[in-house]
Amino acid sequence: MGRKPCCEKVGLRRGPWTSEEDQKLVSHITNNGLSCWRAIPKLAGLLRCGKSCRLRWTNYLRPDLKRGIFSEAEENLILDLHATLGNRWSRIAAQLPGRTDNEIKNYWNTRLKKRLRSQGLDPNTHLPLEDSKLDDTEDDTDDEGGDSSDVTMSDASKSEKRSKKKSKPKETVKVRQPKGPKPAPQLKMCQSDEGPVLLKVPKAPKSPISVNPGPGCNYDDDSEHSSSSTVTTKSHEDHRDSSDFIKALTSVSSFPEAELWSCIKPITNSFSSTALLSEWDSYRAFDSSLFPSSYPQLNSGLPKLEDVNSKSSAVASPVQGMLPAYNPMGMEMQTRMQFSSQLTHEIGQNYGGIFQETCYPQPDMGMSWSMHAELSHCGTESLFATPNPANAPSNFEEVPQPSPCTTSQELQRLAALLDLI
């Protein structure tokens, strides 16, 4: 904040003082003495500001002022004081009684400064000037005004300040950049004895295995925002092997799928479709013992998958909960029998579903497998067979027997389903 102004300067006079104003100011100060300069104009009846009254009294109306030319002793004193104090005219005027600072400054610029230059001395430092700088300084003095050099500080002091500024190294200010907000931890709802609990889900580690799903799969992995990943298949890739889908599904760096697959993968790689079929046939005797004695033809043994493709017989359209009875002697397919509650309890609902869906060819479903068709089928009805009501009608229809060339496709489908399980 600057200095408070001496007055509002509204309705005040400016310009040179008149003799009447000088008389009012002198009479007031001689009668009342010096006081606050802001209050003197009102007390003396002047339309002037306090600063104007102070300067008029100090420089012109003061009774102890000296008028006339400076003496030689005063000139020598001014030169000595300027060599030590510089352009501090008010302090120099304090050493010369009866002389004002403005009067001393004007006398220095008009007389004493030129005298020093004529003697070969620098007026700012009072030291001898070099011959090379003498002409330059004389040209500068001709262009300078009377009061411009008096107001500013000496060149020596300026040069000293410049050298100090250059010597000081610039301080580097470290600016702290704010960090962005941390992402919120991922939570997962888990059931416990006390109730539902929210647990933090650890960040999934990046898998070193690179996934190339190909045109049939769209792979989307966003490990920064979600711990799960999605793999979608297109239905137009009907004849694509299911192992590619399983590879893409299990190679995704998700948690806990990737950890689970790392444990299961060595076991599944050791299996082959031929070994699985041979192991399936080895359990036929055990499976036949589960059927009750009321079905003697089922106890005689279950047919093999190769025999089903080679036999030319009428196959009924499969219905959930129904198991076709096959005559091993080469006879026609017998009437479809319904599972009783005891049979369903002994054999198991899952076993009946897997046996029906995998061991017998389906006339209403194509041999080529697609994920889209499998998902659409699961949306309407269960994959596993359920027992039919006792009064369900048995409709038979004659369908063409699939050719033996489709056996390899059925084996691939069976292997893919076992891998998924």
Curated annotation (Swiss-Prot):
Residues 9-61, 62-116 form the HTH myb-type domain. Residues 37-61, 89-112 bind DNA. Gene3D superfamilies: Homeodomain-like. Residues 136-147 have a biased composition (Acidic residues). Keywords: Activator, DNA-binding, Nucleus, Repeat, Transcription, Transcription regulation. GO terms for biological process: regulation of DNA-templated transcription. Residues 119-240 are annotated as: Disordered. Signal peptide: none annotated. Pfam families: Myb_DNA-binding. InterPro entries: Homeodomain-like_sf, Myb_dom, Myb_TF_plants, SANT/Myb. It comes from the Eukaryota. It is found in: Nucleus. One of its GO terms (molecular function) is cis-regulatory region sequence-specific DNA binding. GO terms for cellular component: nucleus. Possible transcription activator. This is Myb-related protein Pp2. It comes from Physcomitrium patens (Spreading-leaved earth moss).
